[in-house]
Amino acid sequence: MRISVETRFRCPCCGYKTLDAPEALGLCPVCWWEDDGQEDKDASDVRLTVNGALSLAEARAYYAQCGAAHPRFLPYVRKAQLTEQ
């Protein structure tokens, strides 16, 4: 069952509405960040969980530079759809 765009949640890395639920380890197809619950208050912390040694702050910087949470994810990402903005 697909969740409608209206009920989707914003990715903490790229900001697009691509996640079915917050903090549910959803993988964003736009930036390839896996939502582990990290937020602005701890964005510079490295949690060493599903995102490895990558902090949310680093992932955001990479996304701004290259369009993915890390350059190694570039083959997997896609552009955001208008409905995800």
Predicted regions and their residues:
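Compact nucleic-acid interaction/catalytic patches
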Residues: 27, 38-42
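Short cysteine-rich clusters marking metal-coordination/redox-active sites
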Residues: 11-14, 28-31
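Short, non-ligating residues that shape and space the ligands of small metal-coordination modules
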Residues: 20-21, 35-38
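Metal-centered catalytic cores of metalloenzymes
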Residues: 9-10, 16-18, 81-85
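Residues immediately within or flanking Cys/His clusters that coordinate Zn2+
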Residues: 8, 25
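Short, charged low-complexity linear motifs
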Residues: 12-21, 44-51
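Short, intrinsically disordered terminal segments enriched in charged and Pro/Gly residues
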Residues: 1, 41-85
